[in-house]
Amino acid sequence: MRFNQVVLSGSLPNNITTLTFGECFNQVVPPGTLPNSLTTLTFGGYFNQVVLPGSLPNSLTTLTFGYDFNQVILPGSLPNSLTTLRFGRDFNQEVLPGSLPNSLTTLTFGDDFNQVVPPGTLPNNLTTLTFGYYFNQIVPPGSLPNNLTTLTFGNDFNQVFLPGTLPNSLTTLTLGDDFNQVVPPGTLPNSLTTLTFGRYFNQVVLPGSLPNSLTTLTFGYDFNQVILPGSLPNSLTTLTFGHCFNQVVLSGSLPNNLTTLTFGQCFNQVVLPGTLPNSLTTLTF
Protein backbone atom coordinates (compact mmCIF):
# COMPACT_ATOMS: atom_id res chain seq x y z
CA MET A 1 0.00 0.00 0.00
CA ARG A 2 1.76 3.14 -1.21
CA PHE A 3 -0.83 5.76 -0.28
CA ASN A 4 0.91 8.77 1.22
CA GLN A 5 -1.17 11.83 0.36
CA VAL A 6 -2.60 14.60 2.49
CA VAL A 7 -6.20 13.80 3.40
CA LEU A 8 -8.23 16.82 2.31
CA SER A 9 -11.08 18.16 4.40
CA GLY A 10 -14.39 16.75 3.14
CA SER A 11 -12.78 13.96 1.12
CA LEU A 12 -13.90 11.19 3.49
CA PRO A 13 -17.61 10.28 3.62
CA ASN A 14 -19.54 11.26 6.75
CA ASN A 15 -20.71 7.69 7.43
CA ILE A 16 -17.29 6.07 7.65
CA THR A 17 -16.67 4.28 10.98
CA THR A 18 -13.36 2.44 10.38
CA LEU A 19 -10.28 3.93 8.76
CA THR A 20 -6.98 2.10 8.22
CA PHE A 21 -3.94 3.75 6.67
CA GLY A 22 -1.32 1.57 4.95
CA GLU A 23 2.36 1.25 5.76
CA CYS A 24 3.56 4.27 3.74
CA PHE A 25 1.15 6.91 5.05
CA ASN A 26 3.04 9.62 6.95
CA GLN A 27 1.13 12.89 6.68
CA VAL A 28 -0.09 15.35 9.29
CA VAL A 29 -3.83 14.94 9.84
CA PRO A 30 -5.25 18.49 10.13
CA PRO A 31 -8.16 19.22 12.49
CA GLY A 32 -11.54 18.70 10.81
CA THR A 33 -10.27 16.19 8.26
CA LEU A 34 -11.63 13.00 9.85
CA PRO A 35 -15.43 12.58 9.96
CA ASN A 36 -17.36 12.61 13.25
CA SER A 37 -18.70 9.12 12.49
CA LEU A 38 -15.24 7.53 12.87
CA THR A 39 -14.89 5.02 15.74
CA THR A 40 -11.76 3.01 14.78
CA LEU A 41 -8.52 4.49 13.41
CA THR A 42 -5.35 2.55 12.59
CA PHE A 43 -2.12 4.12 11.37
CA GLY A 44 0.44 2.09 9.42
CA GLY A 45 4.08 1.40 10.12
CA TYR A 46 5.64 4.64 8.83
CA PHE A 47 3.29 7.14 10.44
CA ASN A 48 5.24 9.41 12.78
CA GLN A 49 3.51 12.78 12.98
CA VAL A 50 2.42 14.86 15.95
CA VAL A 51 -1.27 14.35 16.68
CA LEU A 52 -2.67 17.87 16.75
CA PRO A 53 -5.40 18.78 19.26
CA GLY A 54 -8.75 18.59 17.48
CA SER A 55 -7.54 16.32 14.69
CA LEU A 56 -9.20 13.19 16.09
CA PRO A 57 -13.02 13.22 16.19
CA ASN A 58 -14.98 12.89 19.45
CA SER A 59 -16.59 9.71 18.11
CA LEU A 60 -13.28 7.79 18.13
CA THR A 61 -13.12 4.81 20.52
CA THR A 62 -10.13 2.77 19.24
CA LEU A 63 -6.77 4.19 18.13
CA THR A 64 -3.77 2.13 17.01
CA PHE A 65 -0.37 3.54 16.07
CA GLY A 66 2.17 1.66 13.93
CA TYR A 67 5.73 0.73 14.76
CA ASP A 68 7.44 4.02 13.77
CA PHE A 69 5.25 6.35 15.83
CA ASN A 70 7.30 8.09 18.52
CA GLN A 71 5.77 11.48 19.26
CA VAL A 72 4.79 13.09 22.55
CA ILE A 73 1.05 12.89 23.14
CA LEU A 74 -0.05 16.43 23.93
CA PRO A 75 -2.77 17.02 26.53
CA GLY A 76 -6.09 17.48 24.73
CA SER A 77 -5.01 15.72 21.54
CA LEU A 78 -6.83 12.45 22.29
CA PRO A 79 -10.65 12.65 22.39
CA ASN A 80 -12.62 11.90 25.57
CA SER A 81 -14.49 9.15 23.70
CA LEU A 82 -11.35 6.98 23.38
CA THR A 83 -11.49 3.62 25.20
CA THR A 84 -8.66 1.63 23.56
CA LEU A 85 -5.17 2.95 22.76
CA ARG A 86 -2.31 0.90 21.33
CA PHE A 87 1.19 2.23 20.75
CA GLY A 88 3.60 0.54 18.35
CA ARG A 89 7.12 -0.74 18.73
CA ASP A 90 9.11 2.53 18.70
CA PHE A 91 7.02 4.65 21.06
CA ASN A 92 9.18 5.74 24.00
CA GLN A 93 7.97 9.13 25.17
CA GLU A 94 7.13 10.44 28.61
CA VAL A 95 3.40 10.21 29.24
CA LEU A 96 2.39 13.72 30.25
CA PRO A 97 -0.22 14.26 33.00
CA GLY A 98 -3.62 14.84 31.41
CA SER A 99 -2.59 13.46 28.02
CA LEU A 100 -4.61 10.24 28.36
CA PRO A 101 -8.40 10.73 28.42
CA ASN A 102 -10.45 9.53 31.41
CA SER A 103 -12.55 7.37 29.09
CA LEU A 104 -9.59 5.06 28.38
CA THR A 105 -10.05 1.45 29.58
CA THR A 106 -7.36 -0.43 27.60
CA LEU A 107 -3.77 0.79 27.11
CA THR A 108 -0.97 -1.09 25.37
CA PHE A 109 2.60 0.13 25.14
CA GLY A 110 4.97 -1.22 22.49
CA ASP A 111 8.30 -2.96 22.90
CA ASP A 112 10.55 0.13 23.22
CA PHE A 113 8.57 1.96 25.89
CA ASN A 114 10.70 2.35 29.02
CA GLN A 115 9.55 5.45 30.89
CA VAL A 116 8.58 5.96 34.51
CA VAL A 117 4.81 6.32 34.86
CA PRO A 118 4.27 8.76 37.75
CA PRO A 119 1.16 8.72 39.96
CA GLY A 120 -1.74 10.58 38.34
CA THR A 121 -0.63 9.83 34.78
CA LEU A 122 -2.88 6.86 34.02
CA PRO A 123 -6.64 7.50 33.91
CA ASN A 124 -8.80 6.06 36.72
CA ASN A 125 -11.06 4.11 34.35
CA LEU A 126 -8.19 2.00 32.99
CA THR A 127 -8.88 -1.73 33.43
CA THR A 128 -6.25 -3.35 31.15
CA LEU A 129 -2.60 -2.26 30.97
CA THR A 130 0.16 -3.92 28.96
CA PHE A 131 3.83 -2.97 29.01
CA GLY A 132 6.13 -4.07 26.20
CA TYR A 133 9.36 -6.01 25.91
CA TYR A 134 11.90 -3.48 27.24
CA PHE A 135 9.94 -1.85 30.05
CA ASN A 136 11.95 -2.11 33.27
CA GLN A 137 11.06 0.79 35.54
CA ILE A 138 10.02 0.85 39.18
CA VAL A 139 6.26 1.27 39.37
CA PRO A 140 5.69 3.84 42.13
CA PRO A 141 2.86 3.20 44.62
CA GLY A 142 -0.25 5.08 43.50
CA SER A 143 0.67 5.07 39.82
CA LEU A 144 -1.66 2.20 38.86
CA PRO A 145 -5.36 3.17 38.80
CA ASN A 146 -7.78 1.66 41.31
CA ASN A 147 -9.98 0.06 38.61
CA LEU A 148 -7.16 -1.91 36.96
CA THR A 149 -8.01 -5.61 36.58
CA THR A 150 -5.41 -6.94 34.10
CA LEU A 151 -1.69 -6.06 34.19
CA THR A 152 0.95 -7.53 31.88
CA PHE A 153 4.68 -6.88 31.98
CA GLY A 154 7.05 -7.65 29.11
CA ASN A 155 10.29 -9.58 28.92
CA ASP A 156 12.75 -7.20 30.65
CA PHE A 157 10.74 -6.20 33.72
CA ASN A 158 12.58 -7.20 36.90
CA GLN A 159 11.66 -4.75 39.65
CA VAL A 160 10.54 -5.26 43.23
CA PHE A 161 6.90 -4.38 43.84
CA LEU A 162 6.71 -1.94 46.73
CA PRO A 163 3.81 -2.34 49.20
CA GLY A 164 0.67 -0.66 47.86
CA THR A 165 1.85 -0.71 44.25
CA LEU A 166 -0.69 -3.23 42.93
CA PRO A 167 -4.31 -2.05 43.28
CA ASN A 168 -6.95 -4.09 45.12
CA SER A 169 -8.96 -4.33 41.89
CA LEU A 170 -6.30 -6.43 40.12
CA THR A 171 -7.42 -9.94 39.09
CA THR A 172 -4.81 -10.99 36.49
CA LEU A 173 -1.04 -10.41 36.71
CA THR A 174 1.42 -11.66 34.09
CA LEU A 175 5.15 -11.22 34.66
CA GLY A 176 7.72 -11.42 31.85
CA ASP A 177 10.65 -13.77 31.42
CA ASP A 178 13.29 -11.73 33.28
CA PHE A 179 11.28 -11.24 36.47
CA ASN A 180 13.08 -12.98 39.34
CA GLN A 181 12.28 -11.17 42.57
CA VAL A 182 11.07 -12.45 45.92
CA VAL A 183 7.40 -11.61 46.38
CA PRO A 184 6.99 -10.63 50.05
CA PRO A 185 3.71 -11.25 51.90
CA GLY A 186 1.28 -8.36 51.42
CA THR A 187 2.60 -7.46 47.96
CA LEU A 188 -0.13 -9.14 45.90
CA PRO A 189 -3.69 -7.84 46.36
CA ASN A 190 -6.47 -10.04 47.74
CA SER A 191 -8.42 -9.55 44.49
CA LEU A 192 -5.86 -11.50 42.40
CA THR A 193 -7.19 -14.69 40.78
CA THR A 194 -4.60 -15.46 38.05
CA LEU A 195 -0.81 -15.18 38.43
CA THR A 196 1.72 -16.13 35.76
CA PHE A 197 5.48 -16.08 36.29
CA GLY A 198 7.91 -15.95 33.37
CA ARG A 199 10.80 -18.15 32.34
CA TYR A 200 13.51 -17.12 34.84
CA PHE A 201 11.51 -16.81 38.05
CA ASN A 202 13.11 -19.12 40.61
CA GLN A 203 12.39 -17.82 44.10
CA VAL A 204 10.97 -19.53 47.17
CA VAL A 205 7.25 -18.87 47.53
CA LEU A 206 6.93 -17.60 51.07
CA PRO A 207 3.89 -18.59 53.15
CA GLY A 208 1.36 -15.75 53.02
CA SER A 209 2.79 -14.24 49.84
CA LEU A 210 0.00 -15.56 47.60
CA PRO A 211 -3.49 -14.14 48.28
CA ASN A 212 -6.42 -16.33 49.29
CA SER A 213 -8.28 -15.19 46.16
CA LEU A 214 -5.82 -16.92 43.79
CA THR A 215 -7.30 -19.70 41.63
CA THR A 216 -4.73 -20.13 38.82
CA LEU A 217 -0.95 -20.18 39.29
CA THR A 218 1.60 -20.81 36.54
CA PHE A 219 5.34 -21.12 37.08
CA GLY A 220 7.81 -20.66 34.22
CA TYR A 221 10.58 -22.76 32.73
CA ASP A 222 13.30 -22.30 35.41
CA PHE A 223 11.25 -22.57 38.61
CA ASN A 224 12.65 -25.32 40.82
CA GLN A 225 11.91 -24.56 44.46
CA VAL A 226 10.35 -26.74 47.15
CA ILE A 227 6.72 -25.84 47.76
CA LEU A 228 6.39 -25.40 51.50
CA PRO A 229 3.18 -26.48 53.26
CA GLY A 230 0.92 -23.45 53.69
CA SER A 231 2.54 -21.44 50.90
CA LEU A 232 -0.21 -22.14 48.33
CA PRO A 233 -3.66 -20.71 49.15
CA ASN A 234 -6.67 -23.00 49.59
CA SER A 235 -8.48 -21.09 46.84
CA LEU A 236 -6.08 -22.49 44.21
CA THR A 237 -7.71 -24.79 41.63
CA THR A 238 -5.14 -24.84 38.78
CA LEU A 239 -1.38 -25.22 39.27
CA THR A 240 1.18 -25.52 36.47
CA PHE A 241 4.89 -26.17 36.95
CA GLY A 242 7.42 -25.46 34.21
CA HIS A 243 10.13 -27.50 32.54
CA CYS A 244 12.78 -27.54 35.31
CA PHE A 245 10.65 -28.29 38.37
CA ASN A 246 11.88 -31.47 40.03
CA GLN A 247 11.23 -31.27 43.76
CA VAL A 248 9.63 -33.72 46.16
CA VAL A 249 5.99 -32.82 46.69
CA LEU A 250 5.67 -32.50 50.46
CA SER A 251 2.60 -33.76 52.26
CA GLY A 252 0.15 -30.90 52.83
CA SER A 253 1.83 -28.61 50.31
CA LEU A 254 -0.95 -28.85 47.71
CA PRO A 255 -4.25 -27.14 48.61
CA ASN A 256 -7.40 -29.22 49.10
CA ASN A 257 -9.35 -27.44 46.33
CA LEU A 258 -6.83 -28.16 43.56
CA THR A 259 -8.49 -29.71 40.49
CA THR A 260 -5.80 -29.39 37.78
CA LEU A 261 -2.09 -30.10 38.32
CA THR A 262 0.56 -30.10 35.58
CA PHE A 263 4.21 -31.06 36.02
CA GLY A 264 6.94 -30.24 33.48
CA GLN A 265 9.31 -32.51 31.56
CA CYS A 266 12.02 -32.71 34.25
CA PHE A 267 9.73 -33.86 37.07
CA ASN A 268 10.77 -37.33 38.20
CA GLN A 269 9.95 -37.78 41.88
CA VAL A 270 8.09 -40.46 43.77
CA VAL A 271 4.61 -39.24 44.68
CA LEU A 272 3.77 -40.69 48.08
CA PRO A 273 0.23 -41.77 49.00
CA GLY A 274 -1.78 -38.90 50.48
CA THR A 275 0.34 -36.24 48.79
CA LEU A 276 -2.13 -35.36 46.03
CA PRO A 277 -5.44 -33.82 47.15
CA ASN A 278 -8.67 -35.78 46.64
CA SER A 279 -10.16 -32.82 44.76
CA LEU A 280 -7.78 -33.40 41.82
CA THR A 281 -9.52 -34.26 38.54
CA THR A 282 -6.76 -33.62 35.97
CA LEU A 283 -3.13 -34.64 36.48
CA THR A 284 -0.33 -34.35 33.91
CA PHE A 285 3.20 -35.66 34.44
Give each language-model segment a name:
Residues M1-R2, T284-F285:
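A detector of long low-complexity, disordered segments enriched in serine/threonine/proline
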Residues R2-S11, C24-P31, Y46-S55, D68-S77, ...:
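Leucine-rich repeat
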Residues L19-F21, L41-F43, L63-F65, L85-F87, ...:
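Conserved hydrophobic beta-strand positions in leucine-rich repeat
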